[in-house]
């Protein structure tokens, strides 16, 4: 694996403080250094979003059921296997609470809780006028479509973050310090901000519900 500590390359290099894009590009450069150096500056990374697969059927059906025209569409993604495993995520009920508070404070904005059909956790909430749940299928092209509709994304560190980064959707990510410098966004011309959470911070967080 390219992210493994045991990864070996033809030319060894120090990876501890490098962004993953730097690591990958350095490996690509090793294939043909002359060709890379001649052509790399001609790449416009802001246009990579045009190469993504796109399927609007699911998102079109979703928005057909919403009659109101909102000023902004905000996506909220609470799910990440990596964040759960490492203890960097909030409880789902707190994500729901955040979404509800935001929807009440900003009635002219549409807030969408993002989920996927194969997730073992599904939202069971009372959806109001400007708080909805979008459940994606297994098609990455459908996720691209709904992501393109967003004006802003609030998320834990997961694939949605990187997809919206490519699409240049402004994003606020709850992430670890390691993931922040290794996989931090903003490389494609968009805006990316982060809130760093420390390892095992959930131990103190859980005490709130034990009192």
Briefly describe each language-model feature range.
Residues 1-211:
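Catalytic machinery of carbohydrate-active enzymes
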């Amino acid at each position: 694996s390219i992210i493994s500590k045991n990864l070996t390359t033809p030319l060894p290099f120090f990876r501890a403080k490098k962004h993953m894009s730097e690591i990958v590009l350095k490996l690509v450069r090793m294939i043909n250094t002359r060709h890379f150096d001649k052509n790399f500056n001609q790449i416009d990374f802001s246009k990579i979003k045009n190469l993504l697969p796109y399927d609007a059927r699911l998102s079109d059906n979703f928005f057909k059921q919403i009659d109101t025209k909102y000023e902004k569409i905000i996506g909220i993604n609470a799910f990440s296997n990596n964040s759960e495993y490492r203890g960097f995520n909030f409880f789902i009920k707190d994500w729901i609470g955040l979404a509800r508070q935001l929807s009440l404070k900003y009635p002219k904005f549409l807030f969408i809780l993002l989920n996927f059909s194969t997730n073992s956790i599904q939202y069971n909430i009372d959806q109001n006028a400007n708080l909805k749940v979008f459940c994606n299928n297994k098609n990455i092209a459908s996720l691209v479509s709904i992501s393109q509709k967003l004006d802003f994304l609030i998320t834990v560190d997961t694939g949605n973050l990187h997809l919206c980064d490519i699409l240049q959707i402004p994003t606020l990510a709850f992430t670890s310090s390691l993931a922040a410098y290794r996989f931090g966004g903003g490389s494609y011309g968009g805006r990316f901000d982060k809130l760093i959470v420390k390892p095992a911070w959930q131990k103190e967080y859980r005490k709130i519900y034990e009192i």
